[in-house]
Amino acid sequence: MCYMCLTLSITQHIEMGMNKLPTKKRAQVLNLLCEGMSMRAIARSTDVSFNTIVKMLEDAGTVCAQMHDEMVRDVNAKRVQCDEIWAFNYCKQRTVASAKAAHADAGDIWTWTGIDADSKLIISYLVGDRSGQAAIELMDDIRDRITDRVQISTDGHRAYLEAVEGAFGGDVDYGQVIKQYGATPTPAGRYSPAECTGVKKVRVEGNPDDAHISTSFVEVHNKTMRMHMRRFTRLTNGHSKKVANHAHMVALYTLFYNFIRTHSKLRMTPAMQAGIASTFLTFEDVIARIDAAQPPAKRGPYKKKEAA
C-alpha cells in the first residue's frame, strides 16, 4: 500500500483546530523533528505537549506533500539514482505474530527515493512496502517530474526491472549495481551488516554510461535520512507507531531537505541547484500554508445587545 498520497485532505487534518502556539515556537518544533529528535524529547525540550506535536506533524506532513507535488516539476535531471530504505512500524515483521495488540499495518515499512545525482534533489519518494507495485509507482512518478531522457541506476532488486520498463519503455538508459555479500556475521541475532565482497555493473536498457552506473549518492542520502529522522534510527525505541505519521515525517523531511536545508557540498539547497527554486524556504512558509488551509472560525450565536 502506498502512503505517499494521504487520503485525508488538509482541511480534514486541520479543522479539528487547537490553540495556536506562536509561529516561532511552531517553527522550532518542526525544525527539531527534522534534526533527529524524537517527539517525546521535543516535548520535554520545548514544553509543548506531545499531542500538540503529533497534530503539528500531521498538518505539516500533509502540507509538505502538497508542496512537493506542486514544486518538484519539470526537473532537468540527467542521472537519477533510486533506492529503498527499511524501517518498521510498531514492531518488526518477524515479530508481528507474537506482538501484543499489533496493528494491521504493523511490520516492515520501506521508503523509496529517486535522487538527481547532480543536484542531489529528491525527485520522488514513496512510503509503502517493497513490492513491484511500489516500484512501479515510484518510476511512474519520476517519469512525470523530469523533462528529458535520463540515465537511471538502481540496485539489483528485481522489482525495478518491470517498473523502469513500464514507465520509460525504451526511452531510458538503465543500469543496475549488483552487490555481492559475504557470510552474515555472528552471532546472527546481533545487528551488523554483511561485508560487501564485490560489485558488478549491469547494463539493462539503452546505453548507460558505465562510469555513472552507481547508487553511491542515494546510499549516502539513506544515511542522511537516518540521521535526520529519529524513527529511522536503528536499535532504539524511536521507531514509528503509526504508518500515517511515518509518511507525514518523510513528507516534512523531504521538503526540509529539498528547499530549506543548506546542502553542505552545494552551499545551497538541492532545489536551488536543480533550478526549480531561487531562494530558501523556511518553516514559517510551511506554517503559513497550514494556516491558510485552516477553515475560518465559526461565528458564535447572535446575542442581542441590551438597551443602555
Which residues make up each language-model segment?
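Residue-level recognition of single "structural anchor" positions
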Residues: 1-308
